[in-house]
Amino acid sequence: MISLALAAETAEHGGEAASHGGLFADPAFWVSIAFLMVVGFVYIKAKNKILGALDGRGAAVKAKLDEARKLRDDAQALLAEYQRRQRDAMKEADEIIRHAKDEAARLRAKAEADLEASIRRREQQAVDRIAQAEAQALAQVRNEAVDVAVSAARSLMAGSLAKADQNRLIDAAIADLPGKLH
């Protein structure tokens, strides 16, 4: 826009400038040159500051992007770690459950075996007690039979045998008794 105004002014005063000493004698020319120099100077000075600010801002944005990328990578690594831990925990829980089931089955089998052994032991004890009771009953019956037989023999012999014969028969029966009881 300024160059259009300058061109228009130069065109207006162009005839005058040419007649009085040319382009270098025209104040508009020098104003335009001065203006361009100021703009160039400001551009050079401001360019470094603007570019520096833009570079700084770009570096800050890049740093933030790098940090965000690093945070994302860290978050993904952490997520992967927690997922791995969860899988490991699930495997461990499954292993614990399997072990508990195996242990329960083993304990149940042991309890059944112990119960069966206990039942067999009690049956054997009952059979032993019955056999012992039978043996005692048989021994009592034998003793009773012997006592009755001895008593009957004594009463029969007492009436029909002499005292010396009675004693001899009793001694013979007593000597014979151990062989007959077994």
Curated annotation (Swiss-Prot):
GO molecular function (one): proton-transporting ATPase activity, rotational mechanism
Keywords associated with the record: ATP synthesis, CF(0), Hydrogen ion transport, Ion transport, Membrane, Transmembrane, Transmembrane helix, Transport
Cross-referenced CDD domains: ATP-synt_Fo_b
Recorded superkingdom: Bacteria
Residue ranges of the propeptide: 1-7
Localization per record: Cellular chromatophore membrane
Residues passing through the membrane, by range: 24-44
Family: Belongs to the ATPase B chain family.
Name of the protein in question: ATP synthase subunit b
Organism of this sequence: Rhodospirillum rubrum
